[in-house]
Amino acid sequence: MHPARARLIHNRPQQQGPVVYWMHREFRAADNWALIHAAELARGRGQPLCVAVCLARGFGPARPEHFAFLVHGLRETARELEAQGIPLVLVRGEPGAEVPLFVRGVRAGLCVTDADPTRIKRAWLAQALPRLDVPVIEVDGRNIVPARAASDKREYMARTIRPKIQRLLPEFLDGFPALPAQGVPWTAPVPRPDWAALLSEFGAPPAAFPPGETAARARLEAFLGLSLPRYADDRDTPVEPAASLLSPYLHFGQLGAQRVALRVLAAQGIGPEARDGFLEQLIIRRELAENFCLFTPDHDTPAAFPAWAAATLEKHRADPRPHLAAEAELEAGDSPDPLWNAAQRQLLATGHMHGWLRMYWAKQVLLWSPDAETALARCLRLNDGLSLDGRDVNGYAGLAWSIGGVHDRPWPERAVFGTVRSMTLSGARRKFDVAAFVARWAGA
């Protein structure tokens, strides 16, 4: 593993004892840099390794089916780990308290964990680290170019981070080594997850997205064969999209972006426009979102908006709105806009919304809300509560782009939006067959 992927975030004296990998973002056994690093450390120290997962009692507005997606996937990951002599332990409660209790309980000598810049994960770490008396190493397994290696500041937009990432890609976009075999087996008694009880508790995941690493790889192969060849032409067409449909798997860490990039680069018969267009989204735009959250602690508030956008939204705060939507109206997909309603119903039915539509969807919420603060809060509640890929850096950056001009520039001034870019129903009709999309989701 490239040493720039790991950093010591809790400097405590080295101790003898097992290695614990606190898995909270990269929920997979394959292609997992944090797991690989933890296994290397355990083998080098002559110590056993286990993986600890803490199911928080709540995760913002996430719904039971989101936990079901996670738990179903974890059951498969646990089987893969067990086959390699690595137990997966699942604890319940507040991660900032429960993980240190577990680490102390097994007399661990070292803890490895996932890097994650989102607000809730920062809070978990802030609570956990003072309670740990062992070194803690954080590994960036989410980004192909580790976020802290790509840039040391918040980037203005894609064009400012793109050359930095492209320069470093040859150094980081490499194949994955095999997971190091464990020389010392885990023998300490640890509770094994009661999968039957957990699956009963959370119910079924959304039918549109079968969970787990195997399903994620199958979805990737389907995309490579069916959708990637036409990605350049159809990626922004919600009716018959060439979208990858990988975002839930990437969000839950059941599939790594680096594996996706390697498969895309190896795929045969793909034109450069399709290949480059997809890799721009997979690498540059995703890692720009990571950069935004890493260097903007208030990434889920209007404080994250650039000064020009904050000023223009304030200037137009009192503009008359064409419609003031109620919360219940939005959640039910019962607005005056048929395209918005269809997008919301797609989200309600599948846990997924097409990427172009999500931008349009958020901008209409701004148009129908008394102010940008209310609009952002509403979008966060709906996106984080309904979307399988919610509660993610890409969602925070995307909503900040849609409502607050983050990673964008001023556009011609309009009512309500000011100089923040607007998107309209008439513009959507010029782009794709809106009537066909509305008809598809009218009864959802």
Regions found by a protein language model. Give the residues of each.
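N-terminal regions that are enriched for targeting/export leaders
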Residues: M1-V19, R25
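N-terminal catalytic cores of NTP/NDP-binding nucleotidyl/phosphoryl-transfer enzymes
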Residues: Q16-E40
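Structural beta-sheet core signal
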Residues: Y21, V51-V53, E138, W401
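N-terminal Rossmann-like or analogous alpha/beta NTP/dinucleotide-binding catalytic cores
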Residues: H37-E40, R45-L49, R57-V112, T118-A123
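Glycine-rich phosphate/pyrophosphate-binding loops
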Residues: A39-L55, M353-H354, P370-L376
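Beta-rich, aromatic/charged-enriched effector core domains that present basic-aromatic interfaces
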Residues: P87, R92-A208, L399-S402
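Glycine/tryptophan-enriched, flexible segments
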Residues: A147, K153-F305, F432-A444
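Active-site-proximal binding-pocket segments
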Residues: T237, P241-A435
